[in-house]
């Protein structure tokens, strides 16, 4: 084994400035060494993708079932702002910090989508000295999982149109085909299209469209399936459309599930990479947090729990969306029980919630921190409703003042919640050691008594109303007669036991993206109700849903380039 493995990073902190420079300057250990030394996994149970990425054999993971589970820690955040919060960075930094203080910890993250990488968001591998690597690979094709998911999605679409072309034995109504094609790219031109043009030999023309791969139900199924059998069962349960008599048509009736599962058989094995400090990270799956549940795969999470003492994972957007779905969908369905929650906040984001413009965030404003705390306070109250202890993790920025942090600390103290400042972006795991100690204290305190927000047998309408009033601070929900009828239909058809997945803006507790802070007394309008029978949840659409994003006027792709030596510049 190379002695390079144990060398410190030296003065990389001074030499490298951007996230990309830090990642490219990092020394990576062979992933087989990380797996062996950190997780006890022999090389024979790995399928390497080069030197620094690998998939873990599902049969090996099945052999771990008798092992006790480690402790599950969720990292969530306040409502997102343009100022940024750093949820992924904190997830990675906390994982490194737990290892730094002597705990055996693993990170569990979602895979980034190509669309946002080339659009406006950039990469999603953490930041500063709290990153997962190889950063470029993770942000681009990685191990090909998303391509496999897109292929499975589009195979089903092809089988639907092929069935209609060759006589339509099932009587599928072309006007009621709900299954759309998918591509992992931001491309607004594909949102609504007309397919099968060009003559009789090309099929029956109809309105169609594309979703970005991370919005596909196949992605949600991929992340909620517990094994290959469950994956194939769920794929078969997908409802692709209806007959003229409104009878649902499932993928199993098209004999599609087997072929779709075959396309996913390698992808479903979890991916293993490493942090900058050579700690293991599972990165697997990546559903949208609005149209789906916004969490990494159940298979990866379960594997990590069998292989470590602490598993640090994250859920998309703020705690009102990501954490609620993590608890009510992922944990409920997978039998997971979290031991602690970290709510990530920044002083500057709280100031934005307090009414400060982005260009004025560097000016001290203690009053705005106090006012913006209402948003964090609501999230703390919400997480407590699930019976899980909370710590507030504050990402430090150079413009933060002592007075501003003291105000935040005092407000948290009044709620009986620990508030810990971290600078893992600048100092890696050592910079989050205090946060790690606080998380261990919460976990070992044994106060967690996890329970979902609502029981399975509660009617669908009441489930959604419970989420709206208990989590969003709304006074009620409202829907027109057609949507109310859809609630009743799903209830009568036997889907009333499924959890609700709310699709709404991530920027506010309301459906108005511009309403920051902690609004209350508003009414949540329900525009539509969609059944994801394979993923086994009901999507309540409470705002404009964008399942195929577009590129901005100046996309991130314009700044990305490839050097003659193969180095990528401008990705992150």
Swiss-Prot record:
Molecular function terms, GO-annotated: ATP binding; formate-tetrahydrofolate ligase activity
EC number: 6.3.4.3
BP GO terms, sorted: tetrahydrofolate interconversion
Binding site for ATP: 81-88
Chain segments annotated as transmembrane: none
Pfam family, one: FTHFS
UniProt keyword Ligase, yes or no: yes
KW Nucleotide-binding (keyword) present: yes
Catalysed reaction equations from the record: (6S)-5,6,7,8-tetrahydrofolate + formate + ATP = (6R)-10-formyltetrahydrofolate + ADP + phosphate
Keywords: ATP-binding, Ligase, Nucleotide-binding, One-carbon metabolism
Pathways per UniProt: One-carbon metabolism; tetrahydrofolate interconversion
HAMAP family linked to this entry: FTHFS (MF_01543)
Protein family: Belongs to the formate--tetrahydrofolate ligase family.
UniProt name for this protein: Formate--tetrahydrofolate ligase
Organism: Granulibacter bethesdensis (strain ATCC BAA-1260 / CGDNIH1)
């Amino acid at each position: 084994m190379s002695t390079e493995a144990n060398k410190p990073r030296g003065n990389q902190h001074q030499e490298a400035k951007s996230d990309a420079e830090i990642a490219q300057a990092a020394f990576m250990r062979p992933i087989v060494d990380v797996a062996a030394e950190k997780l006890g996994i022999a090389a024979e149970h790995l399928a390497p993708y080069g030197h620094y990425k690998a998939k873990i054999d599902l049969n090996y993971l099945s052999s771990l079932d008798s092992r006790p589970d480690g402790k599950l820690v969720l990292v969530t955040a306040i409502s997102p702002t343009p100022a940024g919060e750093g949820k992924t960075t904190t997830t990675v930094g906390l994982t490194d910090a737990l290892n730094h203080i002597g705990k055996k910890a693993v990170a569990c993250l979602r895979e980034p989508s190509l669309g946002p990488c080339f659009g406006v968001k950039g990469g999603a591998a953490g930041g500063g000295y709290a990153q997962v690597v190889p950063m470029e690979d993770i942000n681009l094709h990685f191990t090909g999982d998303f391509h496999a998911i897109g292929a499975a999605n589009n195979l089903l679409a092809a089988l639907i149109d092929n069935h209609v072309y060759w006589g339509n034995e099932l009587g599928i109504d072309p006007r009621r085909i709900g299954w759309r094609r998918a591509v992992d790219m931001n491309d607004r031109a594909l949102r609504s299209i007309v397919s099968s043009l060009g003559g009789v030999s090309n099929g029956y023309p109809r309105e169609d469209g594309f979703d970005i791969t991370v919005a596909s139900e196949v992605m949600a199924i991929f992340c909620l399936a517990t094994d290959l059998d469950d994956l194939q069962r769920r794929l078969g349960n997908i409802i692709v459309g209806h007959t003229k008599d409104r009878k649902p048509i499932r993928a199993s009736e098209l004999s599609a599930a087997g072929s779709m599962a075959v396309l996913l058989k390698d992808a479903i094995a979890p991916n293993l990479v490493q942090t900058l400090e050579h700690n293991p990270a599972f990165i697997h799956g990546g559903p949208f947090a609005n149209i789906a549940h916004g969490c990494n795969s159940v298979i990866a999470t379960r594997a990590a729990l069998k292989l470590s003492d602490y598993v640090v994972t994250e859920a998309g957007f703020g705690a009102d969306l990501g954490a609620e779905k993590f608890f009510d969908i992922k944990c409920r369905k997978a039998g997971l029980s979290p031991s602690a929650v970290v709510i990530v906040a920044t002083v500057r984001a709280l100031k934005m919630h307090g009414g400060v413009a982005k260009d004025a965030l560097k000016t001290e404003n203690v009053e705005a921190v106090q006012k913006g705390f209402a948003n964090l306070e609501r999230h703390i109250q919400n997480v407590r409703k699930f019976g899980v202890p909370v710590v507030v993790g504050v990402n430090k920025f150079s413009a933060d003042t002592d007075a501003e942090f003291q105000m935040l600390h005092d407000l948290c103290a009044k709620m009986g919640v620990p508030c810990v400042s971290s600078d893992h972006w600048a100092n890696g795991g050592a910079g989050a050691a205090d946060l790690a100690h606080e998380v261990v204290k919460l976990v070992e305190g044994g106060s967690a008594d996890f329970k979902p927000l609502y029981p399975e047998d509660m009617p669908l309408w009441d489930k959604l109303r419970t989420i709206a009033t208990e989590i969003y601070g709304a006074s009620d929900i409202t829907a027109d007669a057609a949507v109310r009828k859809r609630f009743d239909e799903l209830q009568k058809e036997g889907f009333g036991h499924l959890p609700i997945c709310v699709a709404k803006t991530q920027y506010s507790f309301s459906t108005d993206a511009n309403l920051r802070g902690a609004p209350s007394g508003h009414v949540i309008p329900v525009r539509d109700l969609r059944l994801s029978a394979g993923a086994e949840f009901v999507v309540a659409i409470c705002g404009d849903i964008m399942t195929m994003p577009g590129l901005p006027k100046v996309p991130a792709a314009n700044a990305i380039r490839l050097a003659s030596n193969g180095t990528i510049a401008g990705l992150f």
